């Protein structure tokens, strides 16, 4: 079953799904802007289009991820994103 999510007054939208091959995940799009997200479970995020500049918890430096690149966010944490142009991503929720 698909689950539709909307954050930051519609600037971030995603569709959650459960896949036999990758488990629980979502695919989404972020408009240009700056965002702070909280996580319950650890997440593996892969950029599909655009780019995401991320301040990963525990890291002092911002890192930019391009299409095909993946980064990991620990569970029960908060992370910051800067998005320079509309960008899409795949997020896998890890156990």
Curated annotation (Swiss-Prot):
Organism in which the protein naturally occurs: Yersinia pestis
Q: Which Gene3D superfamilies does the UniProt record give? A: Jelly Rolls (2.60.120.10)
Q: Does the keyword Zinc-finger apply?
A: no
- Its job: Catalyzes the phosphorolysis of diverse nucleosides, yielding D-ribose 1-phosphate and the respective free bases. Can use uridine, adenosine, guanosine, cytidine, thymidine, inosine and xanthosine as substrates. Also catalyzes the reverse reactions.
Stated family: Belongs to the nucleoside phosphorylase PpnP family.
Gene Ontology MF terms in the entry: guanosine phosphorylase activity; purine-nucleoside phosphorylase activity; pyrimidine-nucleoside phosphorylase activity; thymidine phosphorylase activity; uridine phosphorylase activity
Question: Mind telling me which GO cellular component terms the entry cites?
Answer: cytosol
Q: What SUPFAM superfamilies does the database record attribute to this sequence?
A: RmlC-like cupins
Catalysed reaction(s) here are: a purine D-ribonucleoside + phosphate = a purine nucleobase + alpha-D-ribose 1-phosphate; adenosine + phosphate = alpha-D-ribose 1-phosphate + adenine; cytidine + phosphate = cytosine + alpha-D-ribose 1-phosphate; guanosine + phosphate = alpha-D-ribose 1-phosphate + guanine
What's the protein name?
Pyrimidine/purine nucleoside phosphorylase
